């Protein structure tokens, strides 16, 4: 949880990191909520170890959430989307239905066998979609979860500030 941020910018080590849009389940005392986040990852370190590469970067999330109960019956119709901005050019980076991912209740039951809910205070990133045109670093990353049934969107964007790697 210490890596989660709604900040408009993150700092990363070097220039070899990139975002990937994911639905995010947030378990609070009043139930399950859905958000959208970026599992920002150091791609060079990923060749050494996935877990290590994921722990190195902040995890930007949109500051708004939807009640899971509001979308559970039409979950497969939700759409994930991300854009990468590099050199001032915005390009579609990922797009597709969340139906391509495992449903949140299945993921939660895999995490906690015998139940399909997370303990309050827990957050779970729920998987990502393939990248269009290859993984690439960017100066800004924008994420979105669209609900075409209720005609609404969760959005967040963040700038990526690379820090020099010395030594």
Task: Indicate where each model-derived feature is located.
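Catalytic-core "active-site belt" of small-molecule-metabolizing enzymes
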Residues: 1-119, 123, 130-167
């Amino acid at each position: 949880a210490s890596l989660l941020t709604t900040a408009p910018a993150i700092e990363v080590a070097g220039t070899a990191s990139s975002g990937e849009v994911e639905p995010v389940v947030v378990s609070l005392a009043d139930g399950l909520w859905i958000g959208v986040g970026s599992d920002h990852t150091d791609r060079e370190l990923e060749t050494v170890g996935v877990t290590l590469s994921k722990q190195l970067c902040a995890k930007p999330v949109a500051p708004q959430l939807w009640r899971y109960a509001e979308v559970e019956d039409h979950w497969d119709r939700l759409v994930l989307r991300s854009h990468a901005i590099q050199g001032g050019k915005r390009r579609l980076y990922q797009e597709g239905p969340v139906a391509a991912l495992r449903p949140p209740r299945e993921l939660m039951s895999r995490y906690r066998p015998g139940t399909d809910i997370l303990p309050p205070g827990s957050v779970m990133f729920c998987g990502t979609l393939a990248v269009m045109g290859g993984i690439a670093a960017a100066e800004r990353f924008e994420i979105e979860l669209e609900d075409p049934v209720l005609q609404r969107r969760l959005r967040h964007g963040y700038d990526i500030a690379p820090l020099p790697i010395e030594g």
